Amino acid sequence: MRLEYTDRFQRAYNDLTDRDAERVKKALRLLVENPRHPSLRVKRMQGTDQIWEAGASLSIRLTFEIHGDLIVLRNVGAHDETLKKP
């Protein structure tokens, strides 16, 4: 799997604390290796066909789309805030 970052994801990632950024990096490594890894808690977002969510921690979520072998990262940040604007 390959990763592609949207501008919004990049801006949100840059706003994370160093600790949260490290958690996201670890989650992205797992996502590339095995998108169904249990620690990521990956699930399709309600009301969407193509947007998925995964957890970098209990409080940090990231949203993405999968197109073949490409994962397009859409947003990252605090759980509730990120899921309101996937």
Language model region names:
Residues R2, D7-R11, D15-E22, G55-P86:
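Enriched for short, Lys/Arg-rich terminal
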Residues R29-G55:
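A short, surface-exposed loop/turn module that caps and links secondary-structure elements
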